Regions:
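Hydrophobic alpha-helical transmembrane segments of membrane proteins
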Residues: 1-62, 80-213
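Active-site phosphate/pyrophosphate-handling residues
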Residues: 65
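Short helix-to-coil transition segments within interhelical loops
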Residues: 68-74
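Alpha-helix N-cap/helix-start motif at helix boundaries, enriched for small hydrophobics
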Residues: 76-78
């Protein structure tokens, strides 16, 4: 049931022009900005902003009402929607990595694979954080009333980074992170991303069950 919903969900919004433009934007970032890793960062931000897009499609196509009468559980809808978002995140990351490698080859530069893996791990953690914040809100109140939540994760990270820089915590954190093994950093990023998505799903399911469609 969940797999079928993921396929249905993806076909309802992934081929749309708005979604394809976002994926194209990821490629443009990697082409125009010479700094390796910027495309990966862009892919994470684009994924975060895109999380609300399927909910917009639900309201425009009255799919949210359809979910209420179909023999599909609310939990299957939540898990399926999270799964389709993960698919988009993987697609955006693949495009970002491919463009990064291609442009490094064209420009004749070398890539720091360790740095790219760290950036990717941080990007995955950010997507997980975004899902944990946005999914409960969007499943509870829908896109129209909850669309501004799309900007919350990026603003939260930017605010925390500014605060850390202002009080000097960021410099100390950078020095402390220098000696941390690469596998640990990558594993931590993957774990945080997975936990964020799981938390978002667990919180969203009971909220969605209470919502009248």
């Amino acid at each position: 049931m969940i797999g079928s919903f993921i396929r249905f969900d993806l076909t309802s919004w992934l081929p749309r022009r708005q979604t394809l433009l976002l994926l194209g934007f990821v490629a443009v970032i990697g082409i125009l900005l010479p700094v390796p890793g910027m495309a990966i960062t862009g892919a994470a931000i684009v994924t975060s902003l895109m999380i609300a897009t399927p909910f917009l499609g639900d309201e425009r196509g009255r799919l949210d009402t359809l979910y209420g009468i179909l023999p599909v559980s609310r939990s299957s809808v939540v898990v399926g929607r999270a799964g389709s978002i993960v698919v988009f995140a993987l697609l955006a990351s693949a495009i970002a990595f491919a463009v990064t490698v291609l442009m490094a080859s064209v420009r004749g530069g070398s890539l720091d694979w360790g740095l790219l893996l760290v950036i990717q791990a941080v990007a995955i953690a950010f997507v997980g954080l975004s899902a944990s914040i946005q999914l409960p809100v969007l499943f509870r109140i829908g896109y129209t009333r909850g669309r501004l939540i799309s900007y919350a994760p990026a603003l939260l990270i930017a605010g925390l980074a500014w605060l850390a820089q202002a009080i000097g915590v960021l410099d100390g954190a950078q020095e402390a992170a220098t000696g941390v093994p690469l596998p640990l950093v990558v594993g931590l990023g993957l774990a945080l991303g997975a936990v964020g998505i799981v938390v978002g799903v667990l919180v969203a399911v009971p909220l969605y069950r209470k919502r009248e469609l």
